[in-house]
């Protein structure tokens, strides 16, 4: 198996930022290419939502090693074998909490699916953002307070709460580890 991936990209002024720690697309998306002869057909592409949390489970399964129950990712093996119908993830969770720090990126967490991105900035502020990824791929127009998106906000807020529980993430945890 040959895997090519990278760290996320830097902002070069997009969204008024330099650096890389925000949930916006410029630093949220990372490249991932895998070559696995006799398993992955050459030229195959996939648009499913995967994340670096999935790499360890994937490599363990490929090596036929038991996957510990406390790992948070999901093996990419079904996707690599072309079995997208076995893939159940339709959204990913993100949390950045190292503020204040040299980077000065505000603490925030969010949920991202193929259509929308919901973000909550917290700690010394309480701001929400919602982006319609299909109609606003540059994430330039925050539609969180737009009444047309009320149902989307409610649905994603509930899914975000569920993901925070799934990953055992909370403000209480922040208070324990972040000063």
Residue ranges: model-predicted function:
Residues 39-49, 62-67, 140-149:
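Active-site rim elements
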Residues 24-28, 48-51, 68, 72, ...:
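Short acidic-hydrophobic sequence patches enriched in Asp/Glu that either
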Residues 8-14, 53-56, 61-129, 133, ...:
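C-terminal cap/loop subdomain of S1 sulfatases and analogous C-terminal strand-loop tails that border
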């Amino acid at each position: 198996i040959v895997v090519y991936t990278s760290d996320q990209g830097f902002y070069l002024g997009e969204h008024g930022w330099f650096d890389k720690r925000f949930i916006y697309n410029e630093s949220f998306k990372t490249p991932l290419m895998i070559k696995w002869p006799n398993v992955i057909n050459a030229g195959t592409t996939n648009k499913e939502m995967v994340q670096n949390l999935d790499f360890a489970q994937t490599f363990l399964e490929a090596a036929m090693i038991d996957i510990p129950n406390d790992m948070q990712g999901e093996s990419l093996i079904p996707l690599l074998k072309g079995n997208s119908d076995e893939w159940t993830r339709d959204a990913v969770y993100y949390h950045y909490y190292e503020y204040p720090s040299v980077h000065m990126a505000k603490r925030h967490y969010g949920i991202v699916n193929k259509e929308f991105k919901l973000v909550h900035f917290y700690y010394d502020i309480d701001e929400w953002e919602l982006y319609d990824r299909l109609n606003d791929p540059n994430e330039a127009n925050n539609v969180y307070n737009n009444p047309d998106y009320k149902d989307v906000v409610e649905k994603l807020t509930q899914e975000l709460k569920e993901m925070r529980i799934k990953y055992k993430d909370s403000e209480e945890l922040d208070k324990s580890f972040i000063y």
